[in-house]
C-alpha cells in the first residue's frame, strides 16, 4: 500500500500572467498624426479635382439639354432662335395688368411676356410683380425656351452646379424675397430693384446679344462702361429672334456660356484671360474653351474700331476681381463676337462683317 503525501512548498495553481505590451509613446503618436495629416493634404486636392470634374460633367449636361430643346424649338418655329415675341397691342395674357396697349414701348411687352411665364410656371410666385424697368431679352431669354419645354420654374438645368448662390435662391424664393441671404443675394435698391426680384429665375448661362439684337449699325445694343450687366439701348433698337441659318460658322460660334469660370479653384469673370469653361456652340456641341483662345470681339455700333471693353464690377454676391480691385477691364470676347452671328469666336476673327 502506497501512501501519497502532498509535496511541500509546491503551489497547487500556477497563474501565468501575460507580459504587459509597451504602449505608444507621445513621439510615436505625434509621428502617426503627422503622417495622417500629410496623407490628407495629398488627397484633398485630388478629391477636390474629382468633385469639380463631376460638376463640370453636370454643367455640360445642362448645356446639352438646352441645345436639344433649342433645336426642337427651331424645327417648330421655322428655323428661328427662341426669343420673346409679344408686341404692344398683342400680349395674349390672362392677367389684366399684363395687357400692353398698342403704342407702348416694345420692351414693356417683353417684360409682360416674361412675367406671364413666371406666374404660370412658378408654384412659388403666381402673383410675381411685373418689374419696371425690365428688358428680359438681356439675361432672361432662356425663359422662352423653358416655357417651350413646359417645365416648372425655377428649373435646375438653368443653374451651373457650381453657381451656389443661384441654387440658394431657387431653393427658397420666399427667403430670397425677404433678403435673408444677405450678401449672397442682390440688394433690392436703386433703379434695378424690381428687376432683381426675378433673379431666382435667371440662369448661370447667358445668350450673346447677336442672337436677339436685330438692329442695324448705329442702333444696336451696346455695353455700358460702368459695369458688366448694364447695356445701352435707344428707341430704334430692335429685338427679335435670329434665323439659325444666319450663323456662318456654327461649330465656332458660342450660343450659350456661363458668366463666370466656376469649375476651378478660383472663380473668374468669363472674359478674364485665365478663365476656362464649357460653352455651347450653335452646332449643339459643348466644348471646354479657354478665353485666351477666343477673339477679342467688336463694338457692334462701330465695327471698324477695337473691341468693346467690359468693366467687371462685381455685385456683392459675385466672385471678386482677380486683383482685389473694385473693377477689372477686359475685351468683350464672345459676348460681343466680331461679325455677330456671321463671326467666329474661336479662330481667326471675321473682319468684313457688319
Language-model region placement:
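General helical secondary-structure elements
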Residues: 4, 13-15, 47-51, 60, ...
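Amphipathic alpha-helical segments typified by the pilin-like N-terminal helix
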Residues: 21-61
Amino acid at each position: 500500500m502506497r501512501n501519497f503525501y502532498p509535496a511541500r512548498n509546491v503551489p497547487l495553481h500556477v497563474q501565468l500572467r501575460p507580459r504587459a505590451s509597451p504602449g505608444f509613446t507621445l513621439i510615436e503618436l505625434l509621428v502617426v498624426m503627422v503622417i495622417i495629416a500629410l496623407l490628407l493634404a495629398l488627397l484633398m486636392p485630388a478629391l477636390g479635382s474629382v468633385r469639380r470634374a463631376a460638376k463640370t460633367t453636370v454643367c455640360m449636361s445642362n448645356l446639352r439639354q438646352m441645345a436639344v430643346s433649342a433645336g426642337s424649338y427651331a424645327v417648330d418655329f421655322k428655323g428661328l432662335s427662341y426669343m420673346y415675341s409679344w408686341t404692344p397691342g398683342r400680349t395674349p395674357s390672362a392677367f389684366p395688368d399684363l395687357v400692353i396697349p398698342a403704342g407702348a414701348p416694345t420692351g414693356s411687352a417683353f417684360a409682360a411676356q416674361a412675367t406671364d411665364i413666371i406666374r404660370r410656371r412658378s408654384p412659388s410666385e403666381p402673383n410675381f410683380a411685373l418689374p419696371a424697368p425690365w428688358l428680359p431679352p438681356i439675361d432672361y431669354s432662356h425663359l422662352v425656351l423653358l416655357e417651350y419645354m413646359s417645365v416648372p420654374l425655377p428649373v435646375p438645368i438653368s443653374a451651373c452646379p457650381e453657381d451656389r448662390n443661384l441654387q440658394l435662391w431657387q431653393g427658397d424664393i420666399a427667403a430670397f424675397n425677404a433678403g435673408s441671404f444677405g450678401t449672397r443675394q442682390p440688394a433690392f435698391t436703386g433703379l434695378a430693384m424690381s428687376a432683381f426680384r426675378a433673379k431666382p429665375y435667371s440662369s448661370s448661362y447667358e445668350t450673346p446679344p447677336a442672337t436677339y439684337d436685330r438692329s442695324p449699325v448705329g442702333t444696336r445694343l451696346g455695353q455700358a462702361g460702368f459695369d458688366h450687366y448694364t447695356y445701352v439701348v435707344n428707341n430704334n433698337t430692335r429685338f427679335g429672334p435670329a434665323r439659325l441659318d444666319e450663323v456662318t460658322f456654327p461649330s465656332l460660334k458660342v450660343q450659350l456660356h456661363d458668366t463666370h469660370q466656376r469649375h476651378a479653384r478660383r472663380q473668374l469673370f468669363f472674359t478674364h484671360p485665365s478663365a476656362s469653361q464649357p460653352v455651347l456652340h450653335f452646332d449643339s456641341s459643348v466644348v471646354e474653351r479657354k478665353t485666351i483662345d477666343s477673339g477679342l470681339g467688336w463694338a457692334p455700333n462701330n465695327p471698324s474700331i477695337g473691341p468693346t471693353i467690359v468693366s467687371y464690377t462685381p455685385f456683392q454676391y459675385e466672385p471678386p476681381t482677380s486683383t482685389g480691385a473694385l473693377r477689372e477691364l477686359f475685351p468683350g470676347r464672345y459676348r460681343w463676337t466680331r461679325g455677330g452671328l456671321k463671326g467666329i469666336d474661336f479662330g481667326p476673327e471675321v473682319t468684313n462683317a457688319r
